[in-house]
């Protein structure tokens, strides 16, 4: 595997910076309901909740979609991957989360880089864009998953609430897990899709009717 260049690393840092306008800050992935329900009450339970999502839910599956989109040999294959990714959304809000972030990512990336990118949900858009721009697959998946994890930690910091130091400790602790999941999932294919983060999925469904909330999901 070729060593990533500084330009490639900095491009990924730009894509997954909070400054990149995909609106990730607006989504809690169901965490807001889990706090409301008393399932997440402190740093320990927040880290456990996020770990489950990474290992057994969207974290794992999104890396599969990134890898498959990166390797897609035709536009029809890419469309099929995108359809599968949308079908794996556990609730209407989860579908909205991946679709709207995907639309935003496609729009800004196609405007800044000369790539044909439109109509894709978030992980599929990332995989396709990484291929078109010539970015390394493994590093792209690691950056994506780390940004997803860090966004959930930021949400937990606001919702539980957690201290800034506790939040940064969780990010530090989960960074090796993000690397390990991405390394494994990006070498797999869509036959390895699975989802057993049931409490997180139920939380995403419950959030749709939550009375008072800060996040869109």
Swiss-Prot record:
One of its GO terms (cellular component) is cytoplasm. The keyword Cytoplasm applies. It is found in: Cytoplasm. GO terms for molecular function: nickel cation binding. Keywords: Chaperone, Cytoplasm, Nickel insertion. The keyword DNA repair does not apply. Belongs to the UreF family. UreD, UreF and UreG form a complex that acts as a GTP-hydrolysis-dependent molecular chaperone, activating the urease apoprotein by helping to assemble the nickel containing metallocenter of UreC. The UreE protein probably delivers the nickel. Required for maturation of urease via the functional incorporation of the urease nickel metallocenter. This is Urease accessory protein UreF. It comes from Ruegeria pomeroyi (strain ATCC 700808 / DSM 15171 / DSS-3) (Silicibacter pomeroyi). The lineage of its organism: Bacteria, Pseudomonadati, Pseudomonadota, Alphaproteobacteria, Rhodobacterales. The gene is ureF.
């Amino acid at each position: 595997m070729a060593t990533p260049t500084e330009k490639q690393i900095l491009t990924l840092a730009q894509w997954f910076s909070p400054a990149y306008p995909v609106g990730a800050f607006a989504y809690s992935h169901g965490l807001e309901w889990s706090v409301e329900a008393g399932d997440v009450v402190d740093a320990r339970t927040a880290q456990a909740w996020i770990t489950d999502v990474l290992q057994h839910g969207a974290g794992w599956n999104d890396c599969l979609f990134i890898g498959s989109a990166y390797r897609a040999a035709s536009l029809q294959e890419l469309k099929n991957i995108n359809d599968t990714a949308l079908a794996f959304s556990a609730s209407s809000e989860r579908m909205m989360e991946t679709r709207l972030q995907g639309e935003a990512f496609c729009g800004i990336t196609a405007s800044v880089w000369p790539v044909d990118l439109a109509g894709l949900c978030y992980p599929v858009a990332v995989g396709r864009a990484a291929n078109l721009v010539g970015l390394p697959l493994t590093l792209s998946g690691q950056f994506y998953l780390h940004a997803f994890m860090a966004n959930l930690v930021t949400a937990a910091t606001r919702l539980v609430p957690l201290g800034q130091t506790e939040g940064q400790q969780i990010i530090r602790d989960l960074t090796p897990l993000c690397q390990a999941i991405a390394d494994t999932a990006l070498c797999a294919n869509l036959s390895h899709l699975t989802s057993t983060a049931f409490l997180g999925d139920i939380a995403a469904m419950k959030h749709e009717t939550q009375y008072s909330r800060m996040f869109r999901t």
